[in-house]
């Protein structure tokens, strides 16, 4: 479980602009000294923007050996432990980018590790990535496998038996429109990619969940968002849950029982599927009528369980206990724990020395 630290961001552009004004100031009357002479010995020092090295965005755990864990950080690269967290080593420092969105390990081959770059959260300090990376030797070496224009990859899911097949959730540019958003699929280990779900240039996908019993069935959380220098627009009519049953060839937007069924802007959505019964799907949905939702028929209909959804634009992760479909966790500034499927929550189960939980994995 992660504890995130925050730092003050100071706009470097504003500092450079101020210096530029001094250089471009009028020189005044003839005979005055050139103002650039006063700057010739000026030494620059870095004062920002700050990067979030301490914030953890995701875990990748080898399920056959949970002592092996990969951790992806907001701006500190990828770290690996082979002794259940006693010691850690950086394994991504030689790559061109250090901001991580998601880590996925192939269930059929734990040596195959995928990293999606670009922090998926929406802070002004969130750094953008340059695509998706693949390791065939458990993190010793990496190869960039494309998707550079996606900027932020929120989730990667891999076929349980064929490590060549995977899907990537692409959020796209945080600060403006771009077409490289949605869901991308590869069937050849990343050599080629197809954009199998595209909604529009403003709506990306923040989360994907794959049916463990039928891997051609997937749920995608579409998310319309836009950061500006002085604000954030975290929602729109095209956000929502989309479902495919044919490996991404066709998709439909799920609506029945969800808060946006009758309209209204929808924000960020988190998804999870119960491992013992894939009919059961949970979602936390940002909406004026949002909260925690449950489906018992693979997403065809939904029931609102409660209003809890802690600061969805910054968290929005929900996890189901693998042995109890009524025991769920929602992450936020505190850890929210429910024993009744999300009707009620307690924040007393987990104590922390610092707020903010962004990632969780349950054995």
Give the ranges of each region predicted by the language model.
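N-terminal secretory signal peptides that target proteins for export/translocation
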Residues: 1-8
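Beta-propeller blade termini and top-face loops
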Residues: 27-363
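Bacterial N-terminal signal peptides
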Residues: 9-26
């Amino acid at each position: 479980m992660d504890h995130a630290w925050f730092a003050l961001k100071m706009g470097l552009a504003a500092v450079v602009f101020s210096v530029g004004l001094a250089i471009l100031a009028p020189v005044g009357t003839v005979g005055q000294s050139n103002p650039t002479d006063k700057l010739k010995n000026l030494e620059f020092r870095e004062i920002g923007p700050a990067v979030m090295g301490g914030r953890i965005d995701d875990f990748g755990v080898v399920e056959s050996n949970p002592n092996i864990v990969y951790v992806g950080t907001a701006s500190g690269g990828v770290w690996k432990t082979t002794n259940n967290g006693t010691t850690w080593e950086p394994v991504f420092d030689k790559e061109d980018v250090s901001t991580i969105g998601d880590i996925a390990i192939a269930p059929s081959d734990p040596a195959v590790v995928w990293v999606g770059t670009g922090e998926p959260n929406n802070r002004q300090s969130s750094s953008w990535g340059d695509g998706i990376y693949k390791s065939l030797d458990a993190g010793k070496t990496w190869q960039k496998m494309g998707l550079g224009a996606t900027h932020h990859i929120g989730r990667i899911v891999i076929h349980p038996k064929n490590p060549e097949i995977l899907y990537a959730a692409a959020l796209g540019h945080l600060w403006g429109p771009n077409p490289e958003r949605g869901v991308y699929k590869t069937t050849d280990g990343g050599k080629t990619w197809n954009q199998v779900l595209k909604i529009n240039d403003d709506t990306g996908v923040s989360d994907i969940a794959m049916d463990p019993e039928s891997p051609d069935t997937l749920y995608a959380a579409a998310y319309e968002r836009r950061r500006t220098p002085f604000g954030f627009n975290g929602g729109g009519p095209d956000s929502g849950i989309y479902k495919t049953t044919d490996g991404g060839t066709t998709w439909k937007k799920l609506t029945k029982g969800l808060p946006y069924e009758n309209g209204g802007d929808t924000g960020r959505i988190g998804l999870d599927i119960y491992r013992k019964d894939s009919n059961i799907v949970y979602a936390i949905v940002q909406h004026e009528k949002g909260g925690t939702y449950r489906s018992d028929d693979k997403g065809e209909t939904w029931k609102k369980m409660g209003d809890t959804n802690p600061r969805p634009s910054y968290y929005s992760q929900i996890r189901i206990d693998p042995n109890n479909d009524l025991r769920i966790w929602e992450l936020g500034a505190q850890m929210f724990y429910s024993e009744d499927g999300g009707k009620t929550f307690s924040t007393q189960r987990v104590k922390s020395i610092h707020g903010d939980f962004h990632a969780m994995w349950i054995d």
